[in-house]
Structures are given as C-alpha cells and as structure tokens.
C-alpha cells in the first residue's frame, strides 16, 4: 500500500499532458482508496478561514441565532465548492476515458448541493479519550474541510487509515452513488472523524449530488470489484436512490 494520495488540481487547468496526469491520479485514488486530498483546488483560503471562524460562533449560538455575514459566507463557499465539484467530475470523466463533460451532460448539469457547518459534534468520553463519529458517505462526492483539532480516517483494506494533515488541503471522498455509476470501479469506503480537543468542531462538509431525476445507469467495462459490489444494478433515478439512502 502506498501513502494516502494527494493531488494538485491546479495542474488540470494547464492543459495536456498535465490534464491527463491529474485525471489518471484522480482515477487511481478513487478506485484504490475511495478518497484523496486536494491541494491547488482554487478555493480562497481567506473565505474558508472566515467561514470556519463564523462556524464556531454559529455552533455556540445555535442555528436559530442571527450571525452577521454567516449566510453570505456559506453561499459564497458553496458556490466555490460547486465549481470544484464540476472540475473533479470532469477529471474523473477523463480518467474513465470519457469526454470531460460526460457527467455534467448526464448527471450533474444541475447538481443538488448542500453544506453543513459544525455537523460533527463530538463529546469526550470517560477517561479523556475522544469519541469517534463514523459517517457513511451516501452521495456522489463529499468534500471536507476539517476544523482545528479534527482528524479523519478512511476504512481501507488493512483497517482504518489516517488521513495526513496537510495545510490548506480538502478531503474528497467517493459516495455510493458514484460507486454505482462506475459499476464498482470507484470505491465508496466508510470514513470517520474524530477530534483531539474538547469543544465545537466547525468542520465544513460539502455534498455534491446528481440532479434530481438523472437516470443512474452504471457504466460498463470499468473493472468492477466483484467481491464488494452488489450484482445486477438496475437503472434508478437520483431521487429514488437518495430516498433509499436516507432510509438506511
């Protein structure tokens, strides 16, 4: 097993052969680890830092309290992450030997997106050890910015694998919907978040989903992991699949 993958997405905009190189890196990480770190992602660090700070205040005040500038920052950050989601899907399409716009044309032209701030409350257990919050990724992509003191792990073949701390990086994880679409070529693995200190953890969790009504037909010939993927996927529409996921 090699180290946890880190990908510089800024190279994707330079053009060939860098575009192909990044696409190959994304394809390898998504099919092996089901997750990867992103640097050079183009998300304004000052916007991220501001939202993390405001998110801490938001958690303390409660969701019903007014917080000047908070909702504007949320919308701006979500807009930036939506653009990042589209770029990632273009890189994945290229890595799968498809047109860059394949996913946008068929699934994500009008994506459903959501952003959660401080969505992983953690209390210290008896003895001072941090409790752990396990999360099953149920969407197309999830892009996480971890707050101070937070750490993430991905359940790999050999057990829980620590995601290294990399300043400014975002953690992207593959959701079951994308595993289905790629017929098991991409892996959707459990992840969990924990923290090393007490108090709130205003991590930012952005979810990128296919548009409602998009026909989720698995792509053929992508080397499915037969032992881990259920046989006989039937064609579903995004709304029906998300409803099923929410019920589990």
Language-model features, listed with the residues they occupy:
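C-terminal flanking tails of non-heme Fe-dependent oxygenases
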Residues: 1-64, 70-248
